[in-house]
Every structure is written in C-alpha cells, then in structure tokens.
Amino acid sequence: MKAGVLALQGDVEEHIQAFKKAAQELGISIEVIQVKKPQDLKEIATLAIPGGESTTIGALAKRTGLLDALRDAIKEGLPTLGTCAGAIFLAKEVRDSVVGETKQPILGLMDIAVVRNAFGRQRESFEVDLQVGELGTVRAVFIRAPAFIKAWGDARLAAPLKHPELGQIYAAAFQGHMVATAFHPELSTTVVHKYMLNLAKK
C-alpha cells in the first residue's frame, strides 16, 4: 500500500514514521511518499495533512495547484486525516479565537466548525488521555491547538473536552472517509494512522 503525507510544511517526517509504524503493527507492507504536486495524489491510498500553520498550508496549496487537486481527490473518497492545522484546512467553517472569521484558503470538505488557536500560543501545549470515539483512549498531544465546536450533516464530533471560555468542545471529528484531530496523534500513538490504513484497505 502507498500512503501520502502532504509535504508543504509542518511535521511531515513524524507522520511518515507514524504510518510506517502503524503498517508494521498491522502487518501491511507500505511505502510512504511526500505529496508535493497534484500527480502524487494519484498514487496513494490514504493521505495525512500535518499540523503547522493553516494559513501557510492553504497559500502553498493554492500556489502549487494542489488546492483543487486535493479537494477533488478527497471528494472522490481518498481516506484523509487532518491533524491540528490540517484539520482546520479540512473544515468548512473556520474562525480565529482572536480575530474572528478568517478568509484563508481551505478545502472546506468536513461539515465542522473550528476555532483556530483555541488554546492560545505555544506555551498552551499539554497532553491528556482522551476517549476518541471508536478509536478508544488515545494519548493526545495539543500544541497551539484548534477546537471543534459544531458539526452538521453526517459529521460526528468525538473526544469531548472542557474549555475555560468556549465550554464544551471536541478534539476529533469523523465524516465518512475523513478524520480530523485537534491534537497531534503522530507524536504519541499509532491508533489514528492504523484507522486510516484500515479505511484505505476497505
């Protein structure tokens, strides 16, 4: 099987290693490629969109012609994981905890509303064990994380958390072949990447 990691910026190498380790645990042989141009998407069975800076991802995706290619591939059913900034990139509704509505280029594919920087800046990093729907308990690493506040259509929110200002928020979302996490699973667990590989096998 071939998996891809969108390699415009963010923690690309960590996702590559997480896919490799997940495949090893599942007994699947895997090749993981860095997705940098539209034709790379034709080769892969599943995709991870890493964290980093969501406005940068959007701008670079637009410039490289990947924005439309990604949107088309994911719409056609490519199992896709978006983590942290990658989750913001997948969402239909994005606002910033400080500046309100953002006009950044996004894929706009998941029926979820996301608040950027909901947990403040870098110093607001923390780890916690979370119940993430059918994935069970996951060790979640949050770094300048967003928060999911609403879902509609057939999107489902998971991993509930209490936020000091926003109240009840969620750190994961599922919709068909798409998964979004506010945390960085690639830093602490293979559970989420195994889930993506199993989706790709179906």
UniProtKB/Swiss-Prot annotation:
Active site annotation, chain numbering: 84, 184, 186
GO CC field: cytosol; glutaminase complex
InterPro entries: Class_I_gatase-like (IPR029062), PdxT/SNO (IPR002161)
Any one GO MF annotation of this record: glutaminase activity
Family the entry assigns: Belongs to the glutaminase PdxT/SNO family.
Primary role: Catalyzes the hydrolysis of glutamine to glutamate and ammonia as part of the biosynthesis of pyridoxal 5'-phosphate. The resulting ammonia molecule is channeled to the active site of PdxS.
PANTHER family: PYRIDOXAL 5'-PHOSPHATE SYNTHASE SUBUNIT SNO, PYRIDOXAL 5'-PHOSPHATE SYNTHASE SUBUNIT SNO1-RELATED
Protein name (Swiss-Prot/TrEMBL): Pyridoxal 5'-phosphate synthase subunit PdxT
Taxonomic source organism: Pyrobaculum islandicum (strain DSM 4184 / JCM 9189 / GEO3)
This protein's encoding gene: pdxT
